[in-house]
Curated annotation (Swiss-Prot):
Lineage: Bacteria, Pseudomonadati, Pseudomonadota, Gammaproteobacteria, Enterobacterales
The EC number(s) this enzyme carries: 5.3.1.14
Pathway assigned in UniProt: Carbohydrate degradation; L-rhamnose degradation; glycerone phosphate from L-rhamnose: step 1/3
Cofactor: record remark: Binds 1 Mn(2+) ion per subunit.
Natural source organism: Escherichia coli O139:H28 (strain E24377A / ETEC)
Identification of the protein by name: L-rhamnose isomerase
Length: 419
């Protein structure tokens, strides 16, 4: 331990102790909060089913930074490089299109065996896995509908894909000893004025009921559903709206996924967490950064990221909220994108854990809003960075921006060779 870091750490402990915070306990709590990193940042959501195909479903990865992963081996190697630079517990979130097979596999026929390499890798790296059916970038999603499709056979194809995905998810949980959260997001919607908004939602309701009809061990698998305001090509109507999925998750007692970019730009998911928790058993968060729309920019340590983390910590939602990331920026080094976004999420959680919440609650209950605001603002300038640096050191990861040197070296040695 360097003398400088040790001195800063001791001073930070004293400063936080003065406001009633045990920093060692905060670090122990931080180690209870894994962040699920999303595999698709590494290859711009290409996957391995048809990596040269177009990305559809109203989502878009912009940029052409060299060195993106071209196969599962490269993607896993890139993930390992990123994870070495991120302290604390992590998980990996996979989409169905990241299967591995020597022969083509129809999406309604995916099986656990197509993901066994991911499971073995996760075991070796002490990671949990999460999962998603991939209801986009496919000929049978080309007209903008999947689980709500009016064609019975097409709708059944997507139902069967989601059913198969649940079995893969349960396999992850059984093999790794930690439940896999499987999130269903569909792009279904219409570009222009929609006359019948009810029928697609009726079909989606029935389809989802069929999807989750097979009983799976909740110790292995958790169902989640995700809403969206709009997507490219579905600006006027989205079948799976917030109201639809809030009602579905409440009535079926599934987890509800809140994506930071899936609402109107003036809405924030941090304000939705406490409301949703009154009705649903668990939440899945997709922490992202929307810039004017669901642009999926890299997560910053900004006000909303901090507010999300604070809601989790203030209400002791450690066992009911699953933290995932969802962004994909192809204009910068993809490994750096993972590192920046994930470290920022963890920094926000640490800052939340260092807040004197009990004292702030007392002030709020007493109506002393002056002191509440003063304390909240003074808290921002306390030396949380020294606590973060100690946390990084204990996890053998870089404490500051020196991680970028490792990324640059990897880029020169590995990424530059990919063409």
């Amino acid at each position: 331990m360097t003398t400088q870091l040790e001195q800063a750490w001791e001073l930070a402990k004293q400063r936080f102790a003065a406001v009633g915070i045990d920093v060692e306990e905060a670090l122990r709590q931080l180690d209870r909060l894994p962040v699920s990193m999303h595999c698709w940042q590494g290859d711009d959501v290409s996957g391995f089913e048809n990596p040269e195909g177009s990305l559809t479903g109203g989502i878009q990865a912009t940029g052409n930074y060299p060195g993106k992963a071209r196969n599962a081996s490269e993607l896993r190697t890139d993930l390992e490089q990123a994870m070495r630079l991120i302290p604390g517990p992590k998980r990996l979130n996979l989409h169905a299109i990241y299967l591995e097979s020597d022969t083509p596999v129809s999406r309604d026929q995916i099986k656990p065996e197509h993901f066994k390499n991911w499971v073995e890798w996760a075991k070796a790296n002490q990671l949990g896995l999460d999962f998603n059916p991939s209801c986009f970038s496919h000929p049978l999603s080309a007209d903008g509908f999947t689980l709500s499709h009016a064609d019975d056979s097409i709708r059944q194809f997507w139902i069967d894909h989601c059913k198969a995905s649940r079995r893969v998810s349960a396999y992850f949980g059984e093999q790794l000893g930690t439940p896999s959260v499987m999130n269903i997001w569909i792009p279904d919607g219409m570009k222009d004025i929609t006359v019948d908004r009810l029928a697609p939602r009726q079909r989606l309701l029935a389809a989802l009921d069929e999807v989750i009809s097979e009983k799976l061990n909740p110790a292995h698998h958790i169902d989640a559903v995700e809403s969206k305001l709009f997507g490219i090509g579905a600006e006027s109507y989205t079948v799976g709206s917030n109201e639809f999925y809030m009602g579905y998750a409440t009535s079926r007692q599934t987890a509800l996924c809140l994506d930071a970019g899936h609402f109107h730009p003036t809405e924030v998911i941090s304000d939705k967490i406490s409301a949703a928790m009154l009705y649903v058993p668990q939440l899945l968060l997709h922490v992202s950064r929307p810039v004017r729309w669901d642009s999926d920019h890299v997560v910053l340590l900004d006000d909303e990221t901090q507010a999300i983390a604070s809601e989790i910590v203030r209400h002791d939602l450690f066992d009911r909220v699953h933290i995932g990331l969802d962004f994909f920026d192809a204009s910068i080094n993809r490994i750096a994108a993972w590192v920046i976004g994930t470290r920022n999420m963890k920094k926000a959680l640490l800052r939340a854990l260092l807040e004197p919440t009990a004292e702030l609650r007392k002030l709020e209950a007493a109506g002393d809003y002056t002191a509440r605001l003063a304390l909240l603002e003074e808290q921002k300038s306390l030396s949380w960075q020294a606590v973060w640096e100690m946390y990084c050191q204990r996890h053998d990861t870089p404490t500051g921006s020196e991680w970028l040197e490792s990324v640059r070296a990897y880029e020169k040695a590995i990424l530059s060779q990919r063409g």
